[in-house]
Amino acid sequence: MIINHNLNAMNAHRNMGINTGNSGKAMEKLSSGLRINRAGDDAAGLAISEKMRGQIRGLNQASRNSQDGISLIQTAEGALNETHSILQRMRELSVQAANDTNVTVDRDAIQKELTSLTSEIDRIATTTQFNEKNLLNGDLGTTGAKLQIGANADTALTLEVKIAKMDSTALTITATNVKVGTNADATTSITNINNAIKKYQLKDQVLVHTKID
């Protein structure tokens, strides 16, 4: 029995198939820009690259988390700066009211402005938010806001931002603490407002310190 064959043609066909496959892989790598597109290209290399890719994406997200944290702190600081300006105005009014050149009508007008300013401090404390999270109403005073700035769960790169309640009650400048009906009342109000300003300055230092760390 005679079997006819063309060994050279068969080898050429086989080599052409191999070259076609290699060309396809080369085109795939060229078009994707990746040396490894599937486990068959390099199983060990793929495992390593995926691990590194996950780490890089985690670091990128941690960076975005840091920026969000900075934005949160800046929002709180902006509100606290406004509160500080109001406290300074309240102190100015109390000093004015302590002068006995004022008559009852004058002190009544000053008291109305003080009451309005106190209400504004309360409004700032209850409405200052970042991403619908209240910042100055005391919610962050105990639990704080934890910022994940590390790429992994076991990475100890976290920050905790705590912001105490900053309304008129916490600052001790309610209507009973800030009144200017008499010279003595106005003098007491000056002391109470000075204490409130000291509390503000302490909270502001904590915010700045947290941001630097």
Please provide the spans of the model-predicted regions.
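Primary detection of the long, small/polar-rich alpha-helical "axial" segments characteristic
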Residues: M1-D213
